[in-house]
Amino acid sequence: MRGTSCVGGGAESPGGAGLSEGPRGRWLRLAPVCAYFLCVSLAAVLLAVYYGLIWVPTRSPAAPAGPQPSAPSPPCAARPGVPPVPAPAAASLSCLLGVPGGPRPQLQLPLSRRRRYSDPDRRPSRQTPRETPEAAEGRRPG
């Protein structure tokens, strides 16, 4: 009963010998699986060697700890020969956001992802309209 299927009574396939017949057919089914496993393993080993022995992380040089210069630098790269135009504070701030040592942008979550009440005492009660506080206390899970 080896190699027969439960479905269809175990009859031969109409095309003659299938891929699962004999040791060659078994190898043809396992070859792609083995090749995939070896490729993924080799990639993992190469990444481990690269990040462990070769790759060196680099950082941009830190700003000196001394006092800041009194004269501010121009907010954005000015074109040569064009006199600098005073820009509003918001515009100059947006030009400096990407500069090392400049202000960092304030990242905010979208309104749907923000926590509305960080303090549990400020959280509104789940009291429905026309419901007494005693009924709301009895409804809460213990």
From Swiss-Prot:
UniProt biased composition (Low complexity): 99-111
Extract the InterPro entries matched here.
InaF-motif (IPR029162)
Sequence ranges of Gly residues compositional bias: 1-19
Return the GO cellular component terms, semicolon-separated.
Answer: membrane
Q: Where is it located?
A: Membrane
Stretches for region Disordered:
1-22, 61-83, 99-142
Q: What Pfam families does the database record attribute to this sequence?
A: InaF-motif
- Report the principal subcellular site: membrane
Pro residues: which segments have biased composition? 64-83
Q: Which residues cross the membrane?
A: 36-56
- The reply to whether RNA-binding figures as a keyword in the UniProt entry is no
The protein's name: Putative transmembrane protein INAFM1
Q: Which UniProt keywords apply?
A: Membrane, Transmembrane, Transmembrane helix
Spans of biased composition, class Basic and acidic residues?
117-142
Record membrane topology: Single-pass membrane protein
